[in-house]
Amino acid sequence: MHLKASSILALLVIGANAYPASANSAAALVPEPQQPEAPAVAGSTVGAQVDIHHPRLEARYGRDEPQIMCGYCGKRFWNKPDLEKHIKLKPSKGGHKGQPYKEHSWNRPT
């Protein structure tokens, strides 16, 4: 499609006049900011506090040492499953297999 320069100029003038002057201003072209709406989900955590004392989150919030301690040897762990795995290992692998389970606790040091 070949248009002459006068036809292109006419289309530009018509296009510019199609909108009111206020719509051509920069302020009218910028959309207004909108606040995001909170999700209406029953299990939503919006506004809920995070339990920073959870063993997996303690390092993230400033505690750089594991807090769950083996009551038998004093070795510290980040979570209870790691402690239980440690207890079930043979002594040559760093565990306490064969020791009474009562002697092992997951008390947090004070």
From Swiss-Prot:
Record region (Disordered): 88-110
Cell compartments where the protein resides: Secreted; Host nucleus
Phenotype reported upon loss of the gene: Does not affect vegetative growth, conidiation, conidial germination, nor appressorium formation, but leads to significantly reduced virulence to rice.
GO MF term list: DNA-binding transcription repressor activity, RNA polymerase II-specific; RNA polymerase II core promoter sequence-specific DNA binding; zinc ion binding
Keyword Heme: no
Composition bias, Basic and acidic residues: 100-110
InterPro entries: Znf_C2H2_type (IPR013087)
Zinc finger (C2H2-type) boundaries: 68-96
GO cellular component: extracellular region; host cell nucleus; hyphal membrane
Induction info: Expressed during multiple stages of host plant infection, including prepenetration, early biotrophy, late biotrophy, transition and necrotrophy.
GO biological process: effector-mediated suppression of host innate immune response
Domain of life: Eukaryota
UniProt keyword annotations, A-Z: Host nucleus, Metal-binding, Repressor, Secreted, Signal, Transcription, Transcription regulation, Virulence, Zinc, Zinc-finger
Main location (coarse class): secreted
Signal peptide: 1-18
General function of this protein: Secreted effector that translocates into the nuclei of host cells to reprogram the expression of immunity-associated genes by binding to effector binding elements (EBEs) in rice. Binds the 5'-CCACCTCC-3' EBE of promoters from targeted rice genes and probably recruits a yet to be determined host repressor. Causes ambivalent immunity with increased susceptibility to the hemibiotrophic pathogens Magnaporthe oryzae and Xanthomonas oryzae pv. oryzae, but enhances resistance to Cochliobolus miyabeanus, a necrotrophic pathogen.
The name this protein goes by in its record: Host transcription reprogramming factor 2
